[in-house]
């Protein structure tokens, strides 16, 4: 027997319970694993002599403690609880440690201690450290601080203090001071650390009757000492640690350490909290701490006395020299720590945890600590809890670096790995990773290799092209030279043939040319130049350009250098220009002819005009050719000069081609604005800081960095960089480098990433970087846009200010800084090995493309220029984002204001563009307008943009045109009316049909734009006049201001009225037009007085509007807007010029609007609401609608006072209003040609007939939203019936009257009759044969011989006088007429045979239909539409599945999905043995052929042998080439079942259901979602469930039931003896003989049973089911012809797969019957009748 060595570490582990109790007394917690790790691995590395087995030496422990408590990054806060516990064990050793601890030495005290004796003077008191006078009672000379049982509330006071050198407060007694000085003078002053250590071991002085509440320390022999907080400590703690709101865990750990080591009093705790926490944080901590107070029962209490006693908010009177006072203080600290922990717990936010990802250079252990800290901070879960280990492990895997996470996911047996195992694996992967230097070297090497390969490939292709062209050119030269020789010599002369040994040079025999002595040797001379075209003259990529004359154009966004060839009929492109058209042309060249294709039309914008051209694509041509076709369109001129040919435009300018967006096209037509001559010399030199050319990049010095707030639910988005061409990357590289040098771009690492888009600048090869920030914009909070509206911005510019300065700020957004917390939002990917950049870059300034950038910059610039506006009130300063306009009344004021503005902009840090500046001019361009002399014009560039657009061919092109022209609508009178035919074509889903009306509107808009007048700038000091006119629902007007005796137009306004207003009479439409245009004009007038002039006296209409036309809401709106006399006034009635909308010199004929409206009555002028004296009839109408037994019944009636004239039931669901309209309409129809008084109690019917009917008709029976009104058909019928009576009076009466007047009696009778009629059975509206419809005329019946034979068999009689047969009293309809009638009815309804038969029987047709039922059946069966949609009723008999003859020979396979799955398992691969029913199931992560093959070879084959047959559905994992190849190699017959026929795989499909049902029950019973763990139990049930023969799969396979133990039988002796191996073998032999063979015979007998085949034969036409139908798609497709059949499946023409018979139905082919058809002819007055197939 050996002996074990006891070490301090092993001793603590053996008494681990005591160690945890001691740690708990210190208010800390320790873990055994970390205890061992720190003792054996961490602390020995500190270099203080700590052994790996631990020690109880206090000197070594204190040195380790000083290392642990080191401030800054060198400290180890996580090790504080463990070293504190070690110190407590060593300082006050428990019994099992005392034999290993050396005895303590008694040292004299050197530190200040508590007064030990009574003092004659009271101690001084301070606000921070109060003094307490305890009650006089006997106490021991040595106060016992620690109890004998080592209670948990006292050990907290035994911690060592930090090494503070400050001395405690001196005694207030002078004698005491002298005595202390004497004592200290005798002993040399040691270091502060030694003083503190010795002080803990010195005996205490005599008892004191007065104690001070100072931070306490327990020295040697129970002596109490005080060590106050120093201001430097508090300062360092506050500044070297994050705030509580930022990182509550770290600050809580600091406070816990301070409470443990410094032992502060109640006042010190308040000082500490007040320093480290804000007021709100402190209140929250105190509240949470008071919630943690526990009562006597150990549960949290809310009793105020207990809460205040344990955790007081005011200074308590605790005496710290007594155990009771110190226990109160310890409890207070514990509650304070609990409050800190509870207050620091953030709301649950798993998104924050998910956002913690591993950094590129972060170790897995450090990442795990950050992840655990996030769990503690943002979730209520403890990451150290074993129950949460799975969640933490998954987060660790998924949020690790991609390279580490992917490898961790592929670990074998992942679910059995602990978190420590995953960290160790991650550490291995991390340590083997590629360093940044190695990665950069690899990228550089790969780039060089790729570039070398590309260069070698280019050179090889170049050589190959040179050789090919050399051969072609040689052939061409040989052909030319031979032709020339033939022409000179007049015939063909061949070179004489040489002999085998004859020299080709000297023609002598005996040697060859290479050995000829007469052949000159030496270096070869220069090649003679030829005038013919050689290979060196050909142009291509990387070669010299074509010879002169040449011109470079941009085609398809790429510059192409053309050779100007006036001999070429068509222009030619050699490179692939994009899509080619179907047209082609035959090109004849020197080497033969060939056909080439044309390109599609290319739109080219030139300074000379717009050209749309199609080029000829000839790849074999040496150069791109500019032929006569394009030269003609360009109107090019070729001048031959001494230096060569020059190609210019019609005006002598060089030809240039640009491609740009249509919104910027007007810039092409603008004349270049040259900077002022004085700008370069004076303005640039005087204000260098204001210009971008001299001052560099701007920076708004007064604006703080911007913080971009995100939406609450936003998460980082990462989009990969789009592929970028080499040319584009080189184009934006200088811009990226420039922005990096200026500090606008900086490298970063961010979870956000958006792609960078290179945009080519028009007409150049330069690119500019544009970032796609659409996804970022979706996740950023929206702010209200405050950017000024260009529509009314110039309204603030008075016409008196006619000197202007326009400044365009350069890179305006880059002047605003971004806060560092918001910079990661705009990160993008950029790699440049040459610059050493490979990663992400982000913006430090406000980026372009961000949705809030214009608003943020506009607001910032407005704030910065606010002082300038105040200091210069005489100047007008307009700002639209980065475009600034300064206006003054004189040139001098403009110059002075411009200087002040430039100085201000330079001081503020903004930079203007000197190239675009317009300084002190009387005519400037601003926001696309031309400003001059107080007026604004459309620039010619804007006009040319609209004029140059081609005729739109798509809705998008039309919207572009209307948008461009709509910008100029203020200059176009009646723009809304002109563009009215165009707007309907822009709607989505509308057919784009460009007709004459659209072409006319298109031309009118262009023509109006050419004649656009100059508009005056609004002068807000003068009143405005608005001339309004209305025509056909369109409001038109012109806003003017007086300029002397003239009226100067300010804006032309136009708008379309809404559908309700468009249906009013003309005078009311004028009111609506004035209201609409007044609202639009208010945007320009800014609330200034407005005088309205119109051809109608509308003021009286507005004050007293007619109630029958306007609703109350609309009337109130109009009156509130137009009767505001302070702002709106009405002028006299004027006649307007329809062209200019200005008043005519002569006055028009006046009219009274109120009189006209009064005359505008209903549809019938003589309609009245007073009874007619000489009426022929006086009737009463009523409609009724009510609910009875859950069904709405309705009826209508017309009565007199005493009798019912008409009453009828209406269809179910009819409303009361509709019934009233029907009753009134019926009365008017019956009184046709007579004088009628009709009474109705319906306000709706009365108002419709008198008022609203005409209003509805005028506006097209539409509501204000443009929808159809209710009861449209009934209203139209009523309006039509109003004209039937000779005279008419519709009178309204009260309903449900009780009097005895004639009116009351008639109304009651009408109401009663309507209710009685409603109760009756309503007419069947679904009846197909309508009685009112015109029937067939029997005289036109034509009977065939077959019809006559059937009629004679029926016994029908022939009516000689009428010419038709009669049967059962009805005319007999011939078979052909019956077929046409029933076929038409079926095409209207597509009802089935039974329903159509029932409706025909119910309809009581006046004719007897010959062979009706048979014809009806044929019509329903032969309908193609019904065959494609209706479901099939055909049923196929059940088939028989083929089974194996023994276990393991025939398997069925299937995948089934089981969600949710842990560890990535979400599929289940199921194998079923068809013979025994034995089930094997394997959880998988993917549904692939690789998984199927792997399980087949590794699981099925080793255990059951090689299968002979496999059956499965047509899933991709089974039909894959991998699966089929494995089956072919192994000789397995793989049978694929019919698609969408689960019954074909019925056995495995049924077992899938059984397994999933069992798993569901097991998960519910076990309370877990890990179905993989419960799968064996589900398989056990499936394998032991009896089959159709009463045997379980286990019994069939093993010959006995599974071994079970009866736990209820106490006698286990019978189960202890197991049978021998021989007995098992005999049993299996018996099973094979007695079970397997009969079972196989039973399966074979089922196969021999006859199967009822399907009715389809070869050659039949069938419809095939469409299994995946889309919206409104027919259910069946076809018909198809059957090619092959089996008892259960078919193969049809056009579909490669076999189709199960249950998925088809027969297609009935209707016979071709001759019938008459009507066809159109070229002559509109003629039609053609043909007889043929229907």
Curated annotation (Swiss-Prot):
Its cofactor is Mg(2+). GO terms for molecular function: aspartic-type endopeptidase activity; DNA binding; DNA-directed DNA polymerase activity; RNA binding; RNA-directed DNA polymerase activity; RNA-DNA hybrid ribonuclease activity; structural constituent of virion; zinc ion binding. CDD domains: RNase_HI_RT_Bel, RP_RTVL_H_like, RT_ZFREV_like. Keywords: Aspartyl protease, Capsid protein, Coiled coil, DNA integration, DNA recombination, DNA-binding, DNA-directed DNA polymerase, Endonuclease, Eukaryotic host gene expression shutoff by virus, Eukaryotic host translation shutoff by virus, Host cell membrane, Host cytoplasm, Host endosome, Host gene expression shutoff by virus, Host membrane, Host-virus interaction, Hydrolase, Lipoprotein, Magnesium, Membrane, Metal-binding, Multifunctional enzyme, Myristate, Nuclease, Nucleotidyltransferase, Phosphoprotein, Protease, RNA-binding, RNA-directed DNA polymerase, Transferase, Ubl conjugation, Viral genome integration, Viral matrix protein, Viral nucleoprotein, Virion, Virus entry into host cell, Zinc, Zinc-finger. A zinc finger (CCHC-type) spans 501-518. Residues 1443-1601 form the Integrase catalytic domain. Residues 433-474, 485-498 have a biased composition (Basic and acidic residues). The record marks 129-130, 214-215, 477-478, 533-534, 658-659, 1329-1330 as: Cleavage. This is Gag-pol polyprotein.
């Amino acid at each position: 027997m050996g002996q074990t060595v006891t070490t301090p570490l092993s001793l603590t582990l053996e008494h681990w319970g005591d160690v945890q109790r001691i740690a708990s007394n210190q208010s800390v917690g320790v873990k055994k694993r970390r205890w061992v790790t720190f003792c054996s691995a961490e602390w020995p590395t500190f270099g203080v002599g700590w052994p790996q087995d631990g020690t109880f030496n206090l000197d070594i422990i204190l040195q380790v403690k000083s290392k642990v408590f080191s401030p800054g990054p060198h400290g180890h806060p996580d090790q504080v609880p463990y070293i504190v516990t070690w110190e407590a064990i060593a300082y006050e050793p428990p019994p099992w440690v005392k034999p290993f601890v050396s005895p303590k030495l008694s040292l004299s005290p050197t530190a200040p201690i508590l007064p030990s004796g009574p003092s004659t003077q009271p101690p001084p008191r301070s606000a921070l450290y109060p003094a307490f006078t305890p009650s006089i009672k006997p106490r021991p000379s040595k106060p016992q601080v620690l109890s004998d049982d080592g209670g948990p509330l006292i050990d907290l006071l035994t911690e060592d203090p930090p090494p503070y050198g400050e001395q405690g407060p001196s005694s207030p007694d002078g004698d005491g001071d002298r005595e202390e000085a004497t004592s200290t003078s005798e002993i040399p002053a040691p270091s502060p650390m030694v003083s503190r250590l010795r002080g803990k071991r010195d005996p205490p002085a005599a008892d004191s009757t007065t104690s001070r509440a100072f931070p306490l320390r327990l020295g040697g022999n129970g002596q109490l000492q005080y060590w106050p907080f120093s201001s430097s400590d508090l300062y360092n703690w506050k500044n070297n640690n994050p705030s509580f709101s930022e990182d509550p865990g770290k600050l809580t750990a600091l406070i816990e350490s301070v409470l443990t080591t410094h032992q502060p009093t109640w006042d010190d705790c308040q000082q500490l909290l007040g320093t480290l926490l804000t007021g709100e944080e402190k209140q929250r901590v105190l509240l949470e701490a008071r919630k943690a107070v526990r009562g006597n029962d150990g549960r949290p209490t809310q009793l105020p006395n207990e809460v205040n006693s344990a955790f007081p908010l005011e200074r308590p009177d605790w005496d710290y020299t007594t155990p009771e006072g110190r226990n109160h203080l310890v409890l207070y600290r514990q509650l304070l720590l609990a409050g800190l922990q509870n207050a620091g717990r953030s709301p649950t936010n798993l998104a924050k945890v998910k956002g913690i990802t591993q950094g590129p250079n972060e170790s897995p252990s450090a990442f795990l600590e950050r992840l655990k800290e996030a769990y503690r901070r943002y979730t209520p879960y403890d990451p150290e809890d074993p129950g949460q280990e799975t969640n933490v492990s998954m987060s660790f895997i998924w949020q690790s670096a991609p390279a580490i996470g992917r490898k961790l996911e592929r670990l074998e047996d992942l679910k059995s790995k602990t978190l420590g195992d995953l960290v160790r694996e991650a550490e291995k992967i991390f340590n083997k990773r590629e360093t940044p230097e190695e990665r950069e070297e690899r990228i550089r090497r790969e780039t060089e290799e790729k570039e070398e390969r590309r260069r070698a490939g280019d050179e090889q292709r170049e050589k190959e092209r040179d050789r090919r062209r050399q051969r072609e050119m040689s052939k061409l030269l040989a052909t030319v030279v031979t032709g020339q020789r033939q022409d000179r010599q007049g015939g063909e002369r061949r070179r004489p043939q040489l002999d085998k040994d004859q020299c080709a040079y000297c023609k002598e025999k005996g040697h060859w040319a290479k050995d000829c002595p007469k052949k000159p040797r030496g270096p070869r001379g220069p090649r003679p130049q030829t005038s013919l075209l050689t290979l060196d003259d050909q142009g291509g990529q990387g070669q010299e350009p074509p010879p002169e004359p040449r011109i470079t154009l941009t085609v398809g966004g790429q510059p192409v250098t053309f050779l100007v060839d006036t001999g070429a009929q068509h222009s030619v492109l050699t490179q692939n220009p994009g899509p080619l058209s179907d047209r082609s042309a035959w090109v004849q060249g020197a080497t033969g002819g060939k056909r080439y294709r044309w390109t599609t039309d290319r739109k080219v914008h030139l300074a000379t005009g717009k050209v749309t051209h199609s080029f000829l694509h000839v790849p074999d041509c040496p150069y791109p050719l500019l032929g006569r076709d394009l030269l003609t369109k360009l109107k090019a001129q070729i001048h031959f000069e001494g230096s060569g040919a020059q190609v210019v435009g019609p005006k002598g300018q060089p030809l240039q081609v640009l491609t740009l967006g249509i919104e910027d096209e007007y810039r092409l037509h603008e004349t270049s604005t040259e900077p002022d001559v004085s700008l370069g010399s004076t303005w640039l030199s005087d204000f260098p800081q204001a210009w971008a050319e001299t001052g560099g990049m701007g920076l708004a010095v007064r604006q703080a960095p911007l913080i971009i707030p995100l939406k609450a639910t936003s998460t980082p988005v990462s989009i990969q960089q789009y592929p970028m061409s080499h040319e584009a990357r080189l184009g934006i590289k200088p811009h990226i480098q420039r922005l990096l040098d200026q500090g606008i771009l900086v490298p970063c690492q961010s979870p956000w990433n958006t792609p960078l888009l290179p945009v080519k600048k028009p007409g150049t090869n330069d690119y500019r970087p544009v970032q796609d920030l659409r996804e970022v914009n979706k996740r950023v909070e929206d702010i209200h846009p405050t950017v000024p509206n260009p529509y009314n911005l110039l309204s603030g510019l008075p016409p008196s200010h006619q000197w202007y300065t326009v400044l365009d700020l350069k890179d305006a957004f880059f002047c605003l800084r971004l806060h560092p917390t918001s910079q990661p939002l705009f990160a993008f990917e950029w790699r440049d090995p040459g610059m050493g950049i490979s990663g992400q870059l982000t913006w430090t300034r406000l980026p372009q493309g961000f949705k809030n950038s214009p608003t943020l910059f506009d607001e910032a610039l407005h704030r910065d220029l606010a002082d300038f506006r105040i200091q210069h009130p005489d100047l007008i300063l307009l700002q639209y984002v980065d475009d600034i306009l300064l206006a003054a009344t004189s040139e001098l004021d403009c110059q002075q204001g411009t200087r002040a503005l430039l100085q201000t902009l330079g001081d503020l840090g903004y930079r203007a563009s000197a190239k675009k500046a317009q300084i002190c001019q009387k005519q400037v361009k601003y926001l696309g307008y031309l400003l001059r002399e107080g007026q604004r014009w459309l620039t010619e560039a804007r006009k040319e943009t609209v004029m140059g657009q081609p005729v739109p061919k798509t809705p998008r092109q039309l919207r572009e045109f209307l948008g461009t022209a709509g910008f100029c609508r203020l200059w176009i009178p009646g723009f809304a009316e002109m563009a009215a035919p165009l707007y309907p074509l822009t709607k989505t889903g509308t057919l784009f049909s460009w007709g004459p009306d659209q072409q006319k509107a298109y031309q009118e808009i262009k023509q109006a734009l050419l004649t656009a007048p100059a508009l005056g700038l609004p002068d807000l000091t003068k009143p405005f006049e608005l001339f309004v006119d209305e025509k056909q629902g369109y409001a038109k007007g012109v806003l003017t201001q007086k300029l002397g005796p003239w009226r100067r137009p300010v804006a032309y306004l136009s708008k379309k009225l809404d559908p309700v207003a468009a249906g009013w009479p003309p005078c009311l439409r004028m009111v609506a037009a004035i209201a609409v245009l007044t609202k639009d004009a208010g945007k320009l007038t800014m609330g200034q007085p407005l005088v309205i002039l119109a051809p109608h006296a509308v003021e009286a209409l507005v004050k007293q509007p007619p109630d029958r036309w306007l609703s109350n809401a609309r009337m109130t709106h109009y009156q509130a807007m137009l009767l505001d006399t302070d702002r709106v006034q009405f002028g006299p009635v004027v006649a307007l010029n329809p062209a200019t909308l200005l008043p005519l010199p002569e006055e028009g004929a006046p009219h009274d609007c109120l009189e006209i409206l009064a005359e505008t009555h209903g549809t019938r002028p003589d309609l009245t609401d007073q009874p007619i004296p000489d009426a022929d009839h006086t009737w009463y109408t009523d409609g009724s609608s009510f609910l009875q037994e859950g069904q709405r019944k309705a009826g209508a009636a017309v009565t007199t006072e005493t009798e019912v004239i008409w009453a009828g039931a209406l269809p179910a669901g009819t409303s009361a209003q509709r019934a009233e309209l029907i009753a009134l309409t019926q009365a008017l129809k019956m009184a046709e040609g007579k004088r009628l008084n009709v009474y109705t109690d319906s306000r709706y019917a009365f108002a419709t007939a008198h008022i609203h009917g005409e209003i509805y008709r005028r506006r097209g029976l539409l509501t204000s939203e443009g929808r159809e009104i209710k009861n449209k058909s009934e209203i139209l019928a009523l309006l039509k019936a109003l004209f039937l009576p000779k005279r008419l009076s519709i009178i309204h009466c009260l309903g449900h009257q009780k009097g005895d007047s004639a009116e009351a009696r008639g109304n009651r009778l009408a109401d009663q009759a309507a209710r009685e009629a409603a109760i009756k059975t309503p007419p069947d509206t679904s009846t197909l044969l309508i009685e009112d419809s015109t029937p067939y005329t029997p005289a036109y019946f034509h009977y065939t011989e077959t019809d006559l034979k059937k009629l004679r068999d029926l016994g029908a009689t022939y009516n000689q006088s009428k010419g038709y047969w009669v049967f059962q009293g009805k005319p007999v309809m011939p078979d052909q007429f019956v077929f046409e009638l029933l076929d038409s009815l079926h095409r209207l309804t597509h009802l089935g045979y039974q329903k159509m038969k029932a409706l025909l029987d119910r309809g009581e047709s006046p004719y007897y239909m010959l062979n009706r039922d048979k014809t009806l059946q044929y019509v329903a069966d032969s309908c193609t539409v019904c065959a494609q949609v209706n479901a099939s009723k055909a049923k196929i008999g059940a088939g028989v599945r083929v089974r194996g003859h023994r276990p393991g020979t025939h398997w069925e396979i299937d995948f089934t999905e089981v969600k949710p799955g842990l560890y990535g398992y979400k599929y289940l691969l199921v194998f079923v043995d068809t013979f025994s029913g034995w089930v094997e199931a394997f959880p998988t992560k993917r549904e692939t052929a690789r998984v199927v093959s792997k399980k087949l070879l590794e699981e099925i084959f080793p255990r059951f042998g090689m299968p002979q047959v496999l059956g499965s559905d047509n899933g991709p994992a089974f039909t894959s080439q991998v699966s089929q190849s494995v089956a072919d190699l192994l000789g397995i017959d793989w049978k694929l079942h019919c698609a969408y026929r689960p019954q074909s795989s019925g056995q495995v499909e049924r077992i899938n259901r059984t397994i999933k049902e069992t798993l569901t029950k097991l998960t519910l019973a076990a309370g877990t979602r890990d179905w993989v763990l419960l799968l064996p139990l589900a398989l056990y049930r499936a394998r032991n469930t009896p089959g159709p023969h009463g045997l379980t799969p286990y019994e069939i396979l093993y010959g006995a039931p599974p071994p079970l133990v009866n736990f209820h039988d106490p006698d286990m002796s019978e189960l202890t003896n197991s049978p021998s191996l021989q007995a098992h073998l005999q049993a299996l032999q018996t099973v094979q003989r007695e079970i397997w063979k009969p079972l196989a015979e039973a399966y074979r007998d089922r196969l021999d049973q006859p199967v009822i085949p399907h009715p389809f034969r070869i050659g039949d036409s069938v419809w095939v089911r469409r299994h995946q139908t889309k919206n409104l798609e027919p259910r069946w497709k076809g018909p198809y012809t059957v090619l092959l059949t089996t008892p259960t499946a078919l193969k049809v023409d056009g579909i490669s797969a076999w189709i199960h018979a249950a998925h088809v139905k027969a297609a009935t082919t209707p016979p071709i019957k001759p019938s008459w058809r009507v066809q159109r002819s070229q002559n509109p007055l003629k039609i053609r009748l043909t007889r043929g197939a229907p």
